[in-house]
């Protein structure tokens, strides 16, 4: 009415910038950064598919743009299917179809009419891309699903979910409240259904990694809250990010000094107790990037204090920068410790000492993806899971450390039993099929 308002494209790009920052800031991005895990591929695939789906709902997009969105959509679905999450991928075309038919197009403008043809075509092609490979290869159930979920209680699941989605979930809830009367507009409907669908597999997963599939939809919903935040609330988010990530960086540096120089002694004793046998050495190739990113973090704080930005994404800038800072410090200062305490390399080599590749394959259906990668890459073993592993002459089973003795099974004998990482958490038992 008064002029000076942002153009729709500029406004949309600012929201998109905020969603990227919300995704980067999410703590759930960190777990897959150190391990050889398929979760990173699945996260990228979900993000690609979502970007394509949103583009396909645009009104009267140019043919070249529509083809580009369709390619993103199909590549994302195919990658998600082949990475072992076909049960997730097959539902996404149905969500796109439901959004196209049931969503209101008010967000497109008064006189804009959606073009249903690209979205309808994408639904059928998406079902084809997901169903054909899944049925042909028999990959409906990936190795991350379990008949007995890892969550002891619903509260434990909610705690992991809150940790994975921090700091996006408070903004997500605010979006759902502020825009509750517009929930049938297509961006909100698509992101909401997408979030609910990607949440379901985590309820029956072997671990929390499948929660990462929720991050793209959660980041988009969180970004839609940014235009409604008051200046005081945005500043509160900033200062919380400064306090939280500065404290995190201080703790990381403190324990690095303890494990490297044995000072402070309390930190050194804690590391020795939690990771026995670890001896840290000063590595300049890891230290210099850590110093650089720490100064960059301090510079980001100074920039935010001295300059007031009118950009919509300002409330998430420090959260994203702090998350990147903590991740870089973990991957530099703490990398030797993580390799020693969390890597399956030594465990894989121990299995290889008991079972050589020429003796046949090993059934490792019970193991998580990072352990499978270590057995294949570090030990060079033939590892199989699921139905392909039924005929293997050896079996590697993961059991709780509270069960000290493996149950005897007719036709099998124990070759070795040891703790792959932490003896208080898990034990591996290597079984060999007895000769008949």
Regions picked out by a protein language model, each given a short descriptive name:
Residues 39, 56-436:
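Membrane-embedded architecture of ER/inner-membrane glycosylation machinery
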Residues 1-25, 43:
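Transmembrane-helix signature of polytopic, membrane-embedded enzymes
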Residues 2-4, 32, 59:
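Transmembrane alpha-helix boundary signature
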Residues 30, 42-55, 60, 174:
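Structured catalytic core of nucleotide-sugar glycosyltransferases
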Residues 17, 21-29, 146-153:
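Juxtamembrane loop-helix boundary motifs flanking transmembrane segments in multi-pass membrane proteins
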Residues 28-42, 85-88:
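Short acidic/glycine- and proline-prone juxtamembrane loop motifs at membrane-interface regions
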